Amino acid sequence: MERVIVIGSGVMGRGIAYSSALGGFSTTLVDVKEEQLIGAKKEIQQITDKGVERGKMSETDADSINERLTYSVHLEDVVKEADLIIEAVPENIDIKRSVFERIDQHAPSHCLFASNTSTMSPTEIGSFTKRPEKVIAMHFFNPVHKMKLVEIVRGLETSDETAAAIRSVAEKMGKETVVVNEFPGFVTSRISALVGNEAFYMLQEGVGTPEEIDKAIKLGLNYPMGPFELGDLVGLDTRLNNLKYLHEKLGEKYRPAPLLEKYVKAGRLGRKSGKGVYDYQKND
C-alpha cells in the first residue's frame, strides 16, 4: 500500500489527506473545485506549521508531509495508479453512487475502496462497484488530525484481506480502530445524532441557551465538546442529512428537530458558512 487517493476536499477530506500523508503514504486530494483544493492546501500547511511551532514535529517532518501531498481536479487520471481510494463526499447516496461507479471504471483491479460515511451501508455502496469484496466503510472523526478513532465497518461482501489492510492503513496514520457490524449509524453516529438532535429540541423548547446547554453537556457528562459546538464544526447540513437517513432506517426517535431544519434552510450551516448555532463572523 503506497498510493492513497482522497475524494472530496471538504473538512473531512482534507483531514484524511493530511493523516494519510502523515502515515507515510503518497496522497492525492481530489475535488471538482480548484478553489476548494487551494483552501485545503492552505489549511494543511497551517496544521503542519502549528505542529512545528508546538514542538510536535520537526520542520523536516512537516516538509515531508507536504511533499507527499498533491492536489488534482482530474479524478479519472489520478485513480489509475491508486492502491486505496477514500471517498469523503457529502452524505448523499446518489453522490456516492456516482463517485464509486466512476472510480470502479478507472482504478486498477487491486485497488481498495473506502467510504468515510458515518451512517450509510457499505454493502449498498459496494453494490455500486464490480469489486464489493474490496469495499469497506472507514469512518474518521472531526477534526481528523486530532481525533484518534477510525470506525471500520465491513459490508456483507467485504473480504478479510480488505478489512485487515484498512486496519493497517489506519494504524499507520496513528489511529486507534474499532471494527463494528454493519447497521445504520454504526456505533458512534447513532449516539451522536441523538444527542445533537435532542439539543436542538431543547433549544427549540427554551430549556436553555446554546452556551448553557453546551456547558452542561461538557461539564456534566464529560464531553470534550458541546453538541452545538460539534454540530457547527461538522456542519449542520451534514448533521441533518445523517438524521434524515437514520430516521428513514431506524424510525421516529431520529426525526430531525424542526429548528435544525430551519437553520439549514437559512444557510446557517456552522463554521463553514460563518454562522450556525453560533456566529463566527463576529470573531473575524
Positions of predicted regions on the chain:
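Acidic/polar active-site rim loop that often engages polyanionic ligands
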Residues: 23-25, 80, 143-152, 224-225
